[in-house]
Amino acid sequence: MTTHVVAETMTTHVGVEMTMTHVAAETMTTHVAVETMTTHVAVETERIKKFQRMTKKKEDVLVDVVKKNGGTNMYELFMPDKNHLTKYLFFTGKGGVGKTSIACATAVKLADEGKKVLLISTDPASNLQDVFDKKLDNKGVKIDEVSGLTVLNLDPIEAAEEYKESVISPYRGKLPQSVIANMEEQLSGSCTVEIAAFNEFSNFITDSEISEKYDNIIFDTAPTGHTLRMLQLPSAWSGFISENTHGASCLGQLSGLESKKDIYKKAVETLSDKNLTTLILVTRAEETPIKEAMRASQELAQLDINNQIMIINGVLTEPTDEVSKNLFNKQQNALKDMPEHLRSMKTYIVHLRAYNVVGIDNIRTLFTDDKIYDDVEKSEVDRLPHLREVIDDLYKNGRKVIFTMGKGGVGKTTVAAAIAMGMAEKGVKVNLATTDPAAHLKYVISENKNISMSRIDEKEELKKYQDEVLSKARETMSEDDLEYIKEDLRSPCTQEIAVFRAFAEIVDECDDKVVVIDTAPTGHTLLLLDSSQSYHKEVQRTQGGNIPESVKNLLPRLRSDETEVVIVTLAEATPVYEALRLEDDLKRANIPVKWWIINSSLYKANSTDKLLAAKGNEEVKWIKKVEEHSNGNFAVIEWKADEIKGEKLKELF
């Protein structure tokens, strides 16, 4: 980057010298021209000096941000045309880190350089249509304003529905309706969506005609959790296809995959070929997205996908007020604490932008320029309710089981702790339960006469559940059938069931307390557990229908007035859409949602920094969307620089 800046500066200096020479020549002909051009030179020279000061300042800031290998190294700005990228590019990262924006800007930049580019989304939360302001399909649409760019949207949820029907339709009319309904629910989980997505995109990385047609094929993949499982499918499922001799007893998701075996094998080879494929981890300078990037990187490396680079998006470089300085320091600290594994990776940055990356002009300027307009009309929100309103309502209505639900990194644990403290202040005895893998809840809130805490170790609960199921299965099943059960117990749905059982035990033991839990079961999990008719077929068979009493007791309570699921989100597109999908899934299981909480709002922080004020202004439409969707049952918590713990939790009220 330094070389690039020096070259830019030298070029500009040459431009000034040429202009000054031009001025001298003009002096011989007309005094007016001299004055005009001298003014122009002065303005141009001042602009250059300002650019140099700005560049120097940014470099100094970035040099201070991170030190690695004992020396000072600066992260380069991400410039797709300068980074010698491979043919296939996969962008991955936690929801809301900016994968779509960076993938789109990369595609446009490469196309502007004269390359033929295909941009594909396999993300259920894709907003590519909004970004390009064009109706897209799964065949490919040319973007008129960008010569050489074709964009297509693969909808894995729609593909999963078609796939599910193709598996189930042969059995309709031949098996009882209760069995069909159970099969449908088994094929309604995330596993099926990811298999459908892999089915869709495997064609694009194995088709020789498509390969010859484009210089670069870019995948705007789903958030990390989805992507990991999607990319794990080739080796995991290929191995199981080879070993699968169970015939009709194999998992529903595997139906029809044998015919795709060769395509999958080639897709895996392409993914792990460092000369063909680059995995681009997109993250932000924040603790949770960095942890997610670390986990994704290591799990992908285990699948021999080793050609990885990282982009840190949304880096603030020039703070001007208290809020922006706090954000800047928070980002610096997150980067300094980055795990060694990620420090050794080739890493680039993209600066924080004031605008949403929608429209070709904004896409083109993402890597190079910011635009803050002083004359932009400030949007206003009529009311910004406090968390206290939510707590008062939960108390007044006598809620006994309270879940905070949302995607990773939105602040579920902190909000759960604040709700627990608020209820305890009203004299209610509360048990606060967490699934946070780092037992850091004890640093967030202290136990006292009204607050007790429980921690659920997801890995431990999963192993306990797997051992229990297999122990019972061994009593009656052949080794072949056991292999099938083992495979089923590796599914993500199994982990959700194991964790739900742990919740149920805690709720059962705390009958005299309000239980606040910092995560919630999905509607899919509840429907799998719901009763002997829709309870997971294999688990029911292996346990002889013996659903634990605690689970039997909790399932009906979830639909009663005792229970409240509180949605936690951020005032941004992806987190809001992800939260809406979570809510829809709960509605499938007849679990109503009343309250929404928008966490970490820059709008409510009232920053005077132009960049952050503009970002806050962008939040308004999402705050209004949540207000409308929730019928006014929402609260907004302002962005805070420090980790909120102890008595500071009361500031969230």
For each of these PLM feature ranges, what is it?
Residues 1-45:
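Long, intrinsically disordered low-complexity tandem-repeat segments
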Residues 54-60, 64-83, 268, 272-399, ...:
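C-terminal lobe/tail of nucleotide-utilizing enzymes
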Residues 82-83, 110-113, 143-145, 207-212, ...:
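Conserved catalytic network of the ASCE P-loop NTPase/AAA+ motor domain
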Residues 90-91, 106-110, 119, 124, ...:
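Short, structured motif recognition centered on aromatic/hydrophobic residues
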Residues 90-92, 97-151, 221, 231-235, ...:
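Walker A/P-loop NTP-binding active-site region of P-loop NTPases
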Residues 126-188, 192, 439-490:
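P-loop NTPase motor core
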Residues 126-131, 159-163, 225-229, 290-291, ...:
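Switch/connector loops and helix/strand junctions flanking conserved nucleotide-binding motifs
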Residues 172-286, 292-295, 476-574, 578-581:
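Phosphate/Mg2+-binding loops and adjacent switch elements
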